[in-house]
A protein has these predicted regions:
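Catalytic alpha/beta core domains of metabolic enzymes, predominantly
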Residues: 126-143, 148, 170-321
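Hydrophobic or amphipathic alpha-helical targeting/insertion segments
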Residues: 84-123, 129-149, 154
Length: 382
């Protein structure tokens, strides 16, 4: 991977209804309903709003068999009104629900942390190598019949790992670590490869964007080692609403998109689902502007570790560098020096002259040839 020059990671193509994912396809945008899945009419209407806003997949929670079976009615309701957007069933805890959902949805999301392994009790478990291998066989015994149902119905799957729902088995062996999240996913991917099931999308999510970014990067590295190129679904869990939710999603998803990673994204907001689509669209459109940019002859520092980056050591100058937090510099060359009280910059760059009326809590930067050392809280910019 070239960290200075953008190029999208090559991934395999996955068929999801009439909207394929990965390969040479565009980065897809999706959302998730927050309606009761047994309420067919409400689900259909909300799905339509998501689709009309630009959503290319619609995910619905399927807590039980009844909800999974009702996906058939929701699908019929949408198709009868001219919508052919694929539906995705979101399944937790019960493999039987996934078996049913695979017959009516174009894609089924399962969580490795609770698909076969029992619910978390936060106990430390000890395994011999043989016992650990037996636990993997239990996963195979339950997962392969599900894959066969998916093959029969041309249903894709997403193996979706969540930071907060790793099994006791994985937690005991790896701890609450990115490595544990990656291995939780890889266990299922190896079974898919062995069974020649290729319509697989993967995701690893966390509410902590630093953990999310590091773990997805690590997952891609591990897949490359084993010759896998499954497409990636990106998202930040519990991002929130308003500006905070949008900023948090942009940080996590945007950092990975900038790496060239990601084939579909969902911006998760605590708002109406259709509000997520424009935010996702902006992220994708921004990253597309980087395609074909002029070559940047950058070179990584010898000590830089892409999978576990650390802050470069610097000398502190005033409140910049060293152990200080990064500062925010605003540019005000057009002469407007008003600031939002909630979002004040640390410094304002004002070009060749400083304003007569200044905020004492903000430092000012001026061009070096216009700097007067007698001016308080004003510093030269060379």
């Amino acid at each position: 991977m070239d960290l200075f020059n953008y190029s999208r990671r090559e991934s395999s193509e996955v068929n999801i209804g009439a909207t394929p994912l990965g390969g040479n396809n565009p980065i897809r945008i999706q959302s998730m309903t927050n309606t009761v899945t047994m309420d067919t009419e409400a689900c259909v209407e909300q799905a339509k709003r998501i689709i009309d806003a630009g959503g290319e997949y619609v995910r619905l929670t399927t807590q039980g068999v009844r909800e999974a079976e009702n996906l058939k009615n929701i699908n019929i309701g949408l198709r009868s009104q001219g919508y052919d957007t694929p539906l995705v069933a979101d399944v937790h805890f019960n493999p039987k629900v996934a078996d049913v959902a695979a017959q009516y949805a174009e894609k089924v999301r399962i969580n490795p942390g609770n698909y076969v392994d029992p619910g978390r009790t936060f106990r430390k478990l000890e395994y011999t190598d043989e016992e650990y291998a037996q636990e993997i066989e239990k996963i195979r015994a339950r997962f392969i019949p599900f894959l066969n149902i998916c093959k029969e119905n041309h249903t894709a799957i997403r193996i979706g790992v969540n930071h907060g729902s790793l099994s006791d088995r994985i937690m005991s062996h790896y701890g609450d670590t990115p490595e544990g999240m990656v291995e939780s996913c890889m266990e299922f991917l190896r079974i898919c490869v062995a069974e020649h099931f290729n319509d697989v999308v993967i995701s690893i999510k966390a509410s902590n964007t630093v953990v999310m970014v590091r773990t997805v990067r690590l997952l891609v590295k591990e897949m490359e080692k084993e010759g896998m190129a499954f497409p990636l679904h990106l998202g930040v869990t519990e991002a929130g609403d308003g500006e905070d939710g949008r900023i948090k999603s942009a940080l996590g998803i945007g950092a990975l998109l900038a790496d060239g990673l990601g084939d579909t994204i969902r911006v998760s907001l605590s708002e109406a689902p259709e509000n997520e689509i424009p935010v996702a669209r902006k992220l994708v459109d921004y990253i597309l502007t980087r395609e074909g940019h002029p070559f940047i002859p950058g070179k990584e520092a010898p000590q830089f570790n892409y999978l576990s980056p650390g802050r470069r050591k610097t000398k502190a100058v005033r409140n910049i560098g060293g152990d200080n937090l990064p500062v925010v510099i605003a540019e005000r060359l057009k002469g407007s020096f008003e600031t939002n009280p909630q979002f004040k910059p640390d410094y304002i760059y004002c070009g060749g002259s400083v304003p007569q009326s200044r905020d004492n809590n903000i430092a000012y930067l001026v061009d070096a040839n216009a700097w007067n050392p007698e001016e308080k809280n004003v510093y030269p910019a060379f």
